A protein has these predicted regions:
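Cys-dependent protein tyrosine phosphatase-like superfamily
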Residues: 1-93, 102-113
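Short cysteine clusters
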Residues: 97
Length: 113
């Protein structure tokens, strides 16, 4: 299974939509935490739910946080929470959304990068 990952810093990466089936591979690749920035059902009923992804992540030994952010402009509160997660979660961290763009924007806004 190939997972498209974009490295934003030495220990933070972003990726497009991930599902429960990818969590063990992320743990095997050395990731310690996953941040899901995609609201449930944003892509319709076939999109995996946060609960399903969280269960698989925790079973694989990963820390998991669901911080749903709508496409477009991120709020100051969402940016602040993302910054808190970057400071609190075990690294390396992988954040994802539909394409990875939203997660990348959150990272840049939260870090000034």
């Amino acid at each position: 299974m190939t997972i498209q990952v974009q490295q934003l810093s030495p220990d933070v990466c972003v990726a497009p939509q991930l599902g429960p089936e990818t969590m063990a591979a992320l743990a095997d690749a050395g990731f310690k935490s996953v941040i899901n920035n995609r609201p449930d059902f944003e892509g319709g009923p076939d999109q995996p739910t946060s609960a399903a992804i969280e269960a698989a992540a925790r079973a694989a030994g990963l820390a998991y946080v669901h911080l749903p952010v709508a496409p477009g402009v991120q709020t100051p509160e969402e940016i602040a929470r993302f910054a808190e997660l970057l400071a609190e979660l075990p690294r390396p961290i992988l954040a994802f959304c539909r394409t990875g763009t939203r997660s990348g924007k959150l990272f840049r806004a939260a870090t000034g990068g």
